[in-house]
């Protein structure tokens, strides 16, 4: 009996050791497999006109848009988003969810008013309460044009002077026939972006800015950048809203859309009207601004001719590209 008892003890100890070793071995094996798999996960490239571009999560490059599903945006100080269009350098702002490409001219055009004095009368445009100072709405809309808070409202039955210039003059006379064939008419979000004074849960955000922009659309050939295009292009985590940028200095830097290059100053109109909760500023429009100490969005009277148009168009979804998107090897349309 004693001998049998000893054999049982040896058997139990052996079984315990075996089970322990198997458990440790499995855990080690499983850990190795898990680490191996994680270490080989790769971000799926995005098709940019037939060129595979791998999205990034930091630094300059192509990002998945965190605000709109299916959309990709270029961000940072100088991402590789240069494209030759109309025999000029432009930049790709985004690949839209519908597959089209939103592009912006690398250089601004000559300064001009967003909306010339008395271009739109109050009789036909009741939103435009100060026609002698112009009006901040890009194009005519049906029904009533409202600011996000509803503090400003009225009809806008006529287009801004800058919209007429870009589509009836610039598009006709300055975009060549090849480029026209590469473009597509597209909707632009022309709603107002509101400057908010609240804090906490009621404070401004890029989500609110986008929602304001999307309240009204215009479909056509040539527009301007959205306020949110400029904000989303920044990799500075402090760039959280139009209000933050307006009240600050460089919260929205690290941003190719606010790169003044060798110039002393960059001033260009966006496509969005500016509004305040208090109302009474129908003649204001947003613009992008950069100098030696600032990189931000701000607003200004639409009748001033000290800001420039910076044209934005959309390329067709079946656009095919060559190149790497660098200044020396920009994307080219084939």
Where are these regions (language model features)?
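Long, domain-scale functional regions
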Residues: 46-334
């Amino acid at each position: 009996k004693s001998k049998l008892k000893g054999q049982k003890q040896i058997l139990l100890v052996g079984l315990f050791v075996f089970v322990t070793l198997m458990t440790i071995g499995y855990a080690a094996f499983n850990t190795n497999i898990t680490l191996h798999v994680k270490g080989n996960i790769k971000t799926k490239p995005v098709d940019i006109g037939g060129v595979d571009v791998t999205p990034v999560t930091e630094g300059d490059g192509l990002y998945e848009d965190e605000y709109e599903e299916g959309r990709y945006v270029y961000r940072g100080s100088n991402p590789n988003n240069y494209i030759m269009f109309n025999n000029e350098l432009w930049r790709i702002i985004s690949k839209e969810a519908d597959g089209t490409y939103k592009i912006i001219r690398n250089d601004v055009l000559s300064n001009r008013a967003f909306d010339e004095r008395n271009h739109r009368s109050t009789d036909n445009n009741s939103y435009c309460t100060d026609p002698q100072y112009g009006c901040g709405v890009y194009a005519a809309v049906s029904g009533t044009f409202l600011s996000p808070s509803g503090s400003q409202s009225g009809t806008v039955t006529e287009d801004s002077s800058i919209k007429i210039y870009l589509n009836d003059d610039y598009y006709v006379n300055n975009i060549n026939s090849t480029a026209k064939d590469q473009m597509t008419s597209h909707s632009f979000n022309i709603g107002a972006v509101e400057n908010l004074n609240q804090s906490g849960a009621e404070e401004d955000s890029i989500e609110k800015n986008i929602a304001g922009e999307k309240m009204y659309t215009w479909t056509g050939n040539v527009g301007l950048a959205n306020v949110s295009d400029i904000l989303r292009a920044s990799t500075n985590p402090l760039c959280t809203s139009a209000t933050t940028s307006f009240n600050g200095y460089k919260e929205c830097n690290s941003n190719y859309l606010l790169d003044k290059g060798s110039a002393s100053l960059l001033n260009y109109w966006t496509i969005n009207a500016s509004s305040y909760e208090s109302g009474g500023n129908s003649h204001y429009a947003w613009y992008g601004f950069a100098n030696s100490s600032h990189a931000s969005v701000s607003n200004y009277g639409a009748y001033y001719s000290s800001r420039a148009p910076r044209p934005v168009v959309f390329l067709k979804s079946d656009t095919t590209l060559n190149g790497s998107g660098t200044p020396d090897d920009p994307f080219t349309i084939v």
